[in-house]
A protein has these predicted regions:
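Mixed-charge, low-complexity intrinsically disordered regions
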Residues: 1-88, 94-169
Length: 169
C-alpha cells in the first residue's frame, strides 16, 4: 500500500450506484489508506475535505491480499486508524496501468501535494518499498478515482499537516 493506496475486503458484498442512489441494503467495503498512523490520518483528512479524489494501489498487493479490483459504482467507506467509518466514497473510474504510465491527471486528482510526476512516483515508491513491495516501470498500478459521499462524523476529524507525514509512520 502506498500513499493513497487502498485495501478492500474481498468478502464484503459490492454496492452499486445506480441513477444517483445506493440500494438501502448496500454494504460498502472498507477503504483503508496506507497504514494506521499519521499518513492515514492525513489522507483521510484530504478525502473528507474534498481534496483527495483518487488513490493508487499495487496490483501485486491486490493479488497477495486476495482483494477484488474496484469497479465503477462501488461504494466504499473510508475508515480511520481504528477501522471506524469516516466517510463514504463512490468509485467513478478505474484504470490498471504500468507505473511508468501514470498520468498527471491522476496525480492532480490524488491531490497529495506533488508538483511533478517524478515527485509523485518517488513518494509512492518509497512507501511501497517500505512495506516490502519492489516496484519498477513495469509494475502494474490500480488507479481509482472516486467522489465523496456521506461524511459519518459530526465532530472534528483529526488532521495531520503534510510535514508530519513520513513514509515510515
Amino acid at each position: 500500500m502506498g500513499p493513497g493506496s487502498s485495501r478492500q475486503s474481498p468478502h464484503v458484498r459490492r454496492a452499486r450506484l445506480g441513477l444517483g442512489t445506493v440500494a438501502a441494503d448496500a454494504v460498502p467495503s472498507p477503504l483503508e489508506f496506507a497504514e494506521p498512523g499519521n499518513m492515514r490520518r492525513w489522507l483521510v483528512g484530504l478525502v473528507v475535505d474534498g481534496h483527495k479524489r483518487a488513490t493508487a494501489g499495487l496490483m501485486s498487493n491486490y493479488e497477495a491480499e486476495g482483494e477484488s479490483i474496484e469497479e465503477v459504482g462501488d461504494l466504499q467507506t473510508v475508515v480511520d486508524d481504528d477501522g471506524l467509518p469516516v466517510a463514504d466514497v463512490v468509485v467513478t473510474e478505474v484504470r490498471i496501468i504500468r507505473l511508468a504510465d501514470v498520468p498527471w491527471e491522476f496525480v492532480e486528482a490524488e491531490n497529495e501535494g506533488d508538483v511533478s510526476l517524478a515527485q509523485w512516483r518517488a513518494g509512492h515508491e518509497a512507501y511501497w518499498e517500505s512495506v516490502d513491495y519492489h516496484v519498477d516501470d513495469d509494475t502494474l498500478v490500480v488507479l481509482v478515482w472516486f467522489e465523496l459521499g456521506k461524511v459519518h462524523r459530526d465532530g472534528p476529524i483529526p488532521r495531520v499537516p503534510r510535514h508530519a507525514v513520513d513514509v515510515l509512520n
